[in-house]
UniProtKB/Swiss-Prot annotation:
Name of the gene encoding the protein in the UniProt record: eno
Primary role: Catalyzes the reversible conversion of 2-phosphoglycerate (2-PG) into phosphoenolpyruvate (PEP). It is essential for the degradation of carbohydrates via glycolysis.
Similarity field: Belongs to the enolase family.
Reaction equations catalysed: (2R)-2-phosphoglycerate = phosphoenolpyruvate + H2O
Compartment(s) of residence: Cytoplasm; Secreted; Cell surface
Keywords carried by this UniProt record: Cytoplasm, Glycolysis, Lyase, Magnesium, Metal-binding, Secreted
Listed InterPro entries: Enolase, Enolase-like_C_sf, Enolase-like_N, Enolase_C, Enolase_CS, Enolase_N
Name recorded for this polypeptide: Enolase
Native species: Herminiimonas arsenicoxydans
Named cofactor requirement(s): Mg(2+)
Main location: cytoplasm
Residues that hold (2R)-2-phosphoglycerate according to the record: Q163, K337, R366, S367, K388
Pathway: Carbohydrate degradation; glycolysis; pyruvate from D-glyceraldehyde 3-phosphate: step 4/5
């Protein structure tokens, strides 16, 4: 019997030194599942609510004791004795118990920690690796990593408005080799930055955060690193951007302070299109602000056939919003962040909806992470084909990459690395 007999919520510390929630779930058999939740810096306004204590005298208001208390009291009472194998029923119980549209009462950080811990306990008891528990025998596709090697925006203290500049090893023959490609480019880029007399300190997600002349200078620096590392830009390693455009969208304009520009949606689309013509960029995340749906339509019409356009702040892993985007033909991909919605069942529903509509689903970390590697198992278990989990530094990022390396080893000969085929939305 997989009955839940004990639940413990506790406050731990994330990769930015801020409190976050960890949960242990104990089953009648003696098996335990443990999970901890991430936290974002640039967040969509329609994300599920992360419950913080608000006590300015403790962690500057960022404590999560209330969320932990909710786990240890109300949530515990509601799910004690339930079967851990009934994930959908358990998650529905959490959703109904909270009673709000955005987990504002109990906190998405509380519900997600419980949802994940239950799944991990159930997988452990069944004797299955977590990815296999999620995906059954069909889970065999490794994800293409999108590695954030230069940080800007809310993730760094430099003059870059765009938040992430990523390398994507589309030409690698396996996930293991994709990691090697990325690591070698990362170390080459570090030397290039150092040789320019710029600091090689890293941002929240493990990428470098140099102050360079402008955004194109950052792109050219990455291309130089790719070539010096012995790879061919475009064919072996492509580029991706996360604009996080909501962060610099004000009064109907996109204000690129580092460029000295203030652009309309159409002009910003043209700028992005110019970059895509000049450089091997195959993915742009949040290229328009979350509330600028007309701008998203313009961007999708202009670039949607040749560039993956990922909605993060736009869709916030929410099926209601994603459905609207699909109906309006806005974007062609969704970023999946488990803490944006607050349960595994709702996360899997968003992935499934995207796939059925021909959209890709990119599994993603947050800028504030822990050693929890559940998203690696989600990526393989759901055959999502793409993952975004940082650069080639910081152990909170390596935890996910290393788990994926273990999964690929476990899969053996049936492991498949899709490479450029991961971008099936561009065919």
């Amino acid at each position: 019997m997989s009955a839940i007999v004990d639940i413990i919520g506790r406050e731990i510390i994330d990769s930015r030194g801020n409190p976050t929630v960890e949960c242990d779930v104990l089953l009648e058999s003696g098996v335990m599942g443990r999970a901890s939740v991430p936290s974002g810096a640039s967040t969509g306004s329609r994300e599920a609510i992360e419950l913080r204590d608000g006590d300015k005298n403790r962690y500057f208001g960022k404590g999560v004791l209330k969320a932990c208390e909710n786990i240890n009291t109300e949530i515990s009472e509601a799910i004690m004795g339930l079967d851990a194998n009934e994930q959908a029923f358990l998650d529905r119980t959490l959703i109904d118990l909270d009673g709000t549209d955005n987990k504002a009462r109990l906190g998405a950080n509380a519900t997600l920690a419980v949802s994940m811990a239950v799944a991990k306990a159930a997988a452990e008891e069944s004797g299955l690796p977590l990815y296999r528990y999620f995906g059954g025998s069909g889970a065999m596709q490794m994800p293409v990593p999108m590695m954030n090697v230069i940080n800007g925006g809310a993730h760094a203290n430099n003059n870059l408005d765009l938040q992430e500049f990523m390398i994507i090893p589309v030409g690698a023959p396996s996930f293991r080799e994709a990691i090697r490609y990325g690591a070698e480019v990362f170390h080459t880029l570090k030397k290039i930055i150092n040789d320019k007399g710029l600091p090689t300190s890293v941002g929240d997600e493990g990428g470098f955060a140099p102050s360079v002349e402008n955004h194109e200078a950052a792109i050219k620096m990455i291309l130089q690193a790719i070539e010096q590392a012995g790879y061919e830009p475009g064919t072996q390693i492509a580029l991706g951007l996360d604009c996080a455009a909501s962060e610099f969208y004000k009064d109907g304009k996109y204000h690129l302070a580092g460029e000295g520009m203030s652009l309309s949606s159409a002009d910003f689309t043209n700028l992005l299109g110019t970059w895509c013509d000049k450089y091997p960029i195959i993915s742009i995340e949040d290229g328009m602000a979350e509330n600028d749906w007309d701008g998203w339509a313009t961007l999708t019409n202009a670039l949607g056939k040749k560039v993956q356009l990922v909605g993060d702040d736009l869709f916030v892993t929410n099926t209601k919003i994603l459905r609207e985007g699909i109906q309006k033909n806005v974007a062609n991909s969704i970023l999946i962040k488990i803490n944006q919605i607050g349960t595994l069942t709702e996360t899997f529903a968003a992935i499934e909806m995207a796939k059925r509509a021909g959209y890709t689903a990119v599994i993603s970390h947050r800028s504030g992470e822990t050693e929890d590697s559940t998203i690696a198992d989600i990526a393989v278990g759901t055959n999502s084909l793409q993952i975004k989990t940082g650069s080639m530094s910081r152990s909170d990022r390596m935890a996910k990459y290393n788990q994926l390396l273990r999964i690929e080893e476990d899969l053996g000969d049936i492991a498949s690395y899709p490479g450029r085929n991961a971008f099936y939305n561009l065919k």
